[in-house]
């Protein structure tokens, strides 16, 4: 019976050939009917065996009386039995596949319609994987079934664009060593310009000796700070030697005019009355009796009238002065 079925149920079987083979002998029709029932009878045992296999795997940890090797052999035997029954079902079903192919043209020409509920026709074809990102790895190759894979992702485009721009940015950077090297030269050039802009006023600088002026007038006396109304000379009133030489003729005229307008009331100073007390009295009298504000008196005139000396410097006899009678305890 099997040989007869294999002889008629071949590939590319047409509906006319099947009808001619079935009508030629009654036994051919019974053979086809028995083979279909045998194949159908293999489905239920296979389902029961598959359910038993799942139950064994789920309760494998509860089999405490068996060793791990025995558990492995139990699962292996169930799996081999399941595989054998499934293989037999597939073999019988594939033998009936040419018969199932004739059902479509028969349903088109006949009033009775037959549609197979189960078929293994796609089993011989390679299974196409689904385009699911959950288990598929991203690949550069694109297939005809997944046209969306041909387009690059936005992240890849951004990364490629950034990779192209990054080298250009590095080449456009300028070295920073030039600015660091220029800073010492700029600072060095600024320092001489500040020194050459004008004379620096140093507080407490010793005034230079001028021609035609007494050395006593240029010496800074410590008694200047003891005077009740005299203010110490500010550092910014000091002048350079060149400016002092230019102002000397004008100062001499002012001193001569002041000497004529304001006669000295303190009398002529001699070695007899040159004491620290007389010097203090002369300095206080000069500041109070002048009647002119200190700001109106020129700075050089105040320097010439220090310690109550007369403005006419030429009349002083320096050789006749005796400084031995000065009380140095006051200065200490």
From Swiss-Prot:
It is found in: Nucleus. One of its GO terms (cellular component) is mediator complex. GO terms for biological process: regulation of transcription by RNA polymerase II. The keyword Transcription applies. Keywords: Activator, Nucleus, Transcription, Transcription regulation. Component of the Mediator complex. Component of the Mediator complex, a coactivator involved in regulated gene transcription of nearly all RNA polymerase II-dependent genes. Mediator functions as a bridge to convey information from gene-specific regulatory proteins to the basal RNA polymerase II transcription machinery. Mediator is recruited to promoters by direct interactions with regulatory proteins and serves as a scaffold for the assembly of a functional preinitiation complex with RNA polymerase II and the general transcription factors. It comes from Eremothecium gossypii (strain ATCC 10895 / CBS 109.51 / FGSC 9923 / NRRL Y-1056) (Yeast). Transmembrane segments: none annotated. Residues 125-206, 221-242 are annotated as: Disordered. Residues 144-153 have a biased composition (Polar residues). InterPro entries: Med3. This is Mediator of RNA polymerase II transcription subunit 3. Residues 132-143, 155-166, 184-200 have a biased composition (Low complexity). Pfam families: Med3 (PF11593). The gene is PGD1.
């Amino acid at each position: 019976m099997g040989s007869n079925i294999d002889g008629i149920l071949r590939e590319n079987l047409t509906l006319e050939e099947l009808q001619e083979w079935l009508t030629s002998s009654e036994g051919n029709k019974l053979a086809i009917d028995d083979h279909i029932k045998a194949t159908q009878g293999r489905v239920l045992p296979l389902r029961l065996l598959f359910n038993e296999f799942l139950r064994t795997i789920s309760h494998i940890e509860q089999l405490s009386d068996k060793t791990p090797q025995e558990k492995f052999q139990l699962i292996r035997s169930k799996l081999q039995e399941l595989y054998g029954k499934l293989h037999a079902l597939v073999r019988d079903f594939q033998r009936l596949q040419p018969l199932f192919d004739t059902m479509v043209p028969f349903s088109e020409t006949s009033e009775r319609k037959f549609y197979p509920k189960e078929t293994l026709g796609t089993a011989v074809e390679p299974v196409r994987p689904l385009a699911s990102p959950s288990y598929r790895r991203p690949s550069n190759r694109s297939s005809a079934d997944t046209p969306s894979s041909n387009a690059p992702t936005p992240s890849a485009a951004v990364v490629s664009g950034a990779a192209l721009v990054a080298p250009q940015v590095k080449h456009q950077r300028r070295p920073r060593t030039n600015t660091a090297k220029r800073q010492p030269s700029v600072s060095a050039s600024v320092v001489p310009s500040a020194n050459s802009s004008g004379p620096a006023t140093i507080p407490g600088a010793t005034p230079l000796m001028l021609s035609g002026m007494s050395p006593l007038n240029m010496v800074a006396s410590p008694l200047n700070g003891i005077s009740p109304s005299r203010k110490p000379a500010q550092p910014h009133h000091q002048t350079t030697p060149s400016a002092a030489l230019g102002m000397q003729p004008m100062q001499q005229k002012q001193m001569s005019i002041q000497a004529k307008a304001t006669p000295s009331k303190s009398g002529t100073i001699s070695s007899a009355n040159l004491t620290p007390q007389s010097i203090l009295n002369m300095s206080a009298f000069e500041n109070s009796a002048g009647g002119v504000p200190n700001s109106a008196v020129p700075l050089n005139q105040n320097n010439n009238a220090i310690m109550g000396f007369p403005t006419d410097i030429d009349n002083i006899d320096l050789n006749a002065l005796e400084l031995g009678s000065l009380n140095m305890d006051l200065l200490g």
